[in-house]
Amino acid sequence: MKPSSSNSRSKGHAKARRKTREELDQEARDRKRQKKRRGHAPGSRAAGGNTTSGSKGQNAPKDPRIGSKTPIPLGVAEKVTKQHKPKSEKPMLSPQAELELLETDERLDALLERLEAGETLSAEEQSWVDVKLDRIDELMQKLGLSYDDDEEEEEDEKQEDMMRLLRGN
């Protein structure tokens, strides 16, 4: 037995229904209305464009008429080659100023404290400390200062104070 052909058509896929004249006319009117609406809304340039396109998060909408503020050269500009400036040497400080800088150097103080605490420094740090201490010695000799003079003066003052005390004012 053959299955009936009428049953197979109805179960497979339904036949597309033809639209009536009224439905076709309504769709034509809708298409015509949409065609008239194409393009930008009137006044969109001055008003700042479409306000529903995510301007909710911005406080002030950006004016589309305002462009870049970078100046544009109007004529042919000559290429300017930059001349490399020679690196200027460090400004020469007076020996007194250089000595003050070295004495107040935080890195030098920290490394000297580590040395006094008994820590061993790396070769690079040790050489840096040696260079700085040598420079301090040179500057003190130039200025006529020495650590020994300060200690001797303090000892002299202590001896004078002792003598005054022994004499009994």
UniProtKB/Swiss-Prot annotation:
Residues 147-159 have a biased composition (Acidic residues). Interacts with Der. NCBIfam families: PRK05244.1-1. One of its GO terms (molecular function) is GTPase activator activity. Residues 49-58 have a biased composition (Polar residues). InterPro entries: YihI. This is Der GTPase-activating protein YihI. Belongs to the YihI family. The keyword Acyltransferase does not apply. The lineage of its organism: Bacteria, Pseudomonadati, Pseudomonadota, Gammaproteobacteria, Enterobacterales. A GTPase-activating protein (GAP) that modifies Der/EngA GTPase function. May play a role in ribosome biogenesis. Coiled coil: none annotated. Residues 20-30, 160-169 have a biased composition (Basic and acidic residues).
